Amino acid sequence: MVTAVFPGSFDPITRGHLDMIQRASRLVDRLIVAVMVNTSKQPLFTMTEKVAMISDELTGLPNVEVQAATGLTVDFMASVHATVLVRGLRNEQDFGYERDIAWMNKSLDETIETICLIARPPYAYFSSSLIKEVAKMGADVSKYVPTAVAQKLHQRLGTDQHD
């Protein structure tokens, strides 16, 4: 049985993330979406809120689970007996970053294999950070994040969207 981990801060989860999760879930027996802390960013949502938002969006994927995780990704992977790390690539800048992370992870744990999925064109040009910036200005971001997530995002930012 192949268990994989798809880690991220998911602040918030995007349609691009969800596309990667759906695609990765078809490649492995068990996929764990690991909601992790990004120490270089100040999160908008708590870990508990992010786990709940993501779980709500993944009800149709029986081999996918969502877990909060702290510390090194390789340590979390060892704790859940995962050997495959799934990452997404939007552009060439992502490739360089992900290559370096893959090499570091491999040096920390030889059993880890990293699989990179290329973002599909509709999702290749935005990130959670960019979506938050646009949402702060009051723009509707529901084409980038699920509707329920967009509502929570606007509520948190004080930029509620009215129909």
UniProtKB/Swiss-Prot annotation:
GO CC annotations on file: cytoplasm
Quaternary structure and interacting proteins, as annotated: Homohexamer.
Positions annotated to bind substrate: 9, 41, 73, 87
Primary enzyme class: transferase
Gene3D superfamilies on file: HUPs
HAMAP family: PPAT_bact (MF_00151)
Entry similarity comment: Belongs to the bacterial CoaD family.
E.C. number(s) listed in UniProt: 2.7.7.3
Cofactors: Mg(2+)
Localisation per UniProt entry: Cytoplasm
Example of a GO biological process term: coenzyme A biosynthetic process
Residues under site feature: Transition state stabilizer: 17
Single GO MF descriptor: pantetheine-phosphate adenylyltransferase activity
Record pathway: Cofactor biosynthesis; coenzyme A biosynthesis; CoA from (R)-pantothenate: step 4/5
Stretches assigned to coiled coil: none
Native species: Lactiplantibacillus plantarum (strain ATCC BAA-793 / NCIMB 8826 / WCFS1)
NCBIfam families: coaD_prev_kdtB, cyt_tran_rel
CDD domains membership: PPAT (cd02163)
The protein, known as: Phosphopantetheine adenylyltransferase
Gene (UniProt): coaD
Domain of life of the organism encoding this protein: Bacteria
Biological role stated in the UniProt entry: Reversibly transfers an adenylyl group from ATP to 4'-phosphopantetheine, yielding dephospho-CoA (dPCoA) and pyrophosphate.
Reactions listed under catalytic activity: (R)-4'-phosphopantetheine + ATP + H(+) = 3'-dephospho-CoA + diphosphate
UniProt keyword terms in alphabetical order: ATP-binding, Coenzyme A biosynthesis, Cytoplasm, Magnesium, Nucleotide-binding, Nucleotidyltransferase, Transferase
Residue numbers binding ATP: 9-10, 17, 88-90, 98, 123-129
